[in-house]
């Protein structure tokens, strides 16, 4: 019975064996190194909220930075005009008219809070299209663009509002609809650059020039909407 008792308690036998001081020291050093290595590995990871943050110095430099392909809608020369009342020219192109998008596009500008001060629809004469796009005359696609704009009726609009030029560019989206963000007119309603539905002035100066080009004297209507006090302080 004593022999069986001794066999059933091997741990007691082993623990009773004498340990040399060198063995104990090596064992302690091994435990210390393992614990230190474990702490270093834990220190490399912060809370999950910072795991993929560029503010984390231990991780942000090791992760490859993904290039952003989002189009920059706001041009530098438009930033200073964001608090000024401006006018801009918006044109719904023949494809937008043929697809029945006129109401949809006008609604987006109205919901934004801009004031429609000019509106008409007519077939675009070739001479007018060439004058409008004269800065693109040297481009290889120029003639194709003129043919497209004159292929059917266009809807010409003049809009007024605070920062209307830059905001309109944002509403319209990037020239290439495939790069335009969802929620923009082109991002939602177009798929190809050559059929991108709508045109918008790219600067306050061009807004004035294009309104003067497409509208005759007396065709611009100045009025005060009832909602004006609720749009601006």
From Swiss-Prot:
InterPro entries: NDK-like_dom (IPR034907), NDK-like_dom_sf (IPR036850), Nucleoside_diP_kinase (IPR001564), Nucleoside_diP_kinase_AS (IPR023005). It is found in: Plastid, Chloroplast. Its cofactor is Mg(2+). One of its GO terms (cellular component) is chloroplast. GO terms for molecular function: ATP binding; metal ion binding; nucleoside diphosphate kinase activity. It catalyses: a 2'-deoxyribonucleoside 5'-diphosphate + ATP = a 2'-deoxyribonucleoside 5'-triphosphate + ADP; a ribonucleoside 5'-diphosphate + ATP = a ribonucleoside 5'-triphosphate + ADP. ATP binds at residues 93, 141, 169, 175, 186, 196. The keyword Calcium does not apply. It comes from the Eukaryota. GO terms for biological process: CTP biosynthetic process; GTP biosynthetic process; UTP biosynthetic process. Residues 1-67 form a transit peptide. Transmembrane segments: none annotated. The active site is at 199 (pros-phosphohistidine intermediate). It is an enzyme of class 2 (transferase). Its EC number is 2.7.4.6. SMART domains: NDK (SM00562). Belongs to the NDK family. This is Nucleoside diphosphate kinase 2, chloroplastic. The lineage of its organism: Eukaryota, Viridiplantae, Streptophyta, Embryophyta, Tracheophyta.
């Amino acid at each position: 019975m004593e022999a069986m008792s001794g066999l059933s308690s091997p741990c007691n036998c082993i623990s009773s064996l004498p340990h040399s001081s060198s063995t104990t020291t090596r064992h302690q050093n091994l435990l210390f190194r393992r614990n230190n290595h474990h702490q270093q590995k834990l220190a490399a990871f912060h809370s999950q909220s910072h795991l993929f943050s560029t503010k984390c110095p231990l991780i942000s430099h090791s992760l490859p930075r993904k290039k952003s392909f989002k189009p920059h809608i706001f041009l530098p020369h438009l930033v200073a005009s964001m608090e000024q009342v401006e006018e801009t020219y918006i044109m719904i192109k023949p494809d937008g008219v043929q697809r029945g998008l006129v109401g949809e596009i006008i609604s987006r500008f109205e919901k934004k809070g801009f004031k429609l001060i000019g509106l008409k629809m007519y077939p675009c004469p070739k001479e007018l299209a060439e004058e409008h796009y004269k800065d693109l005359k040297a481009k290889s696609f120029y003639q194709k663009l003129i043919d497209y704009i004159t292929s059917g009726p266009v809807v010409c609009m003049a809009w007024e509002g605070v920062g209307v030029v830059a905001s309109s560019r944002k509403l319209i989206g990037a020239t290439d609809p495939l790069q335009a963000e969802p929620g923009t007119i082109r991002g939602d309603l177009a798929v190809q650059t050559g059929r991108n539905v709508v045109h918008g002035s790219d600067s306050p100066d061009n807004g004035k020039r294009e309104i003067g080009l497409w509208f005759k004297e007396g065709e611009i209507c100045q009025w005060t909407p009832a909602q004006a006090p609720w749009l601006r302080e």
